[in-house]
């Protein structure tokens, strides 16, 4: 398990094989994705496409300055990362719109 600053330093975990597959597919490391969860300006919604378990989707800025989309589930007091990718132009625009007030 990896400790992250999300929500006051709760634990983050992921399957190493899933993390490697995610990096090959999306070019995003889970270690970077967990930093997006610490973004105070992140947008988070419940994943409407998940029927099996309650999942969450966060659009946030990672430590490298990339806007990422991170999917995860809560396992007790631990965040279990499921997938992470770079935001589409539309998702990035939605994230940035919150600063235009």
Segments (PLM) and residue ranges:
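Ribonuclease/tRNase effector modules and their secretory precursors
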Residues: 1-101
């Amino acid at each position: 398990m990896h400790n992250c600053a999300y929500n006051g330093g709760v634990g983050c975990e992921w399957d190493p094989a899933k993390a490697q597959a995610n990096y090959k597919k999306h070019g995003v490391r889970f270690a970077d994705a967990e930093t997006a969860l610490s973004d105070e300006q992140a947008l988070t919604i419940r994943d409407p496409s998940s029927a099996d378990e309650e999942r969450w989707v966060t659009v946030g800025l990672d430590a490298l300055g990339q806007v990422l989309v991170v999917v995860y589930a809560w396992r007790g007091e631990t965040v279990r990362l499921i997938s992470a990718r770079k935001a589409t132009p539309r998702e990035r625009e939605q994230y940035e719109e919150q600063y235009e007030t």
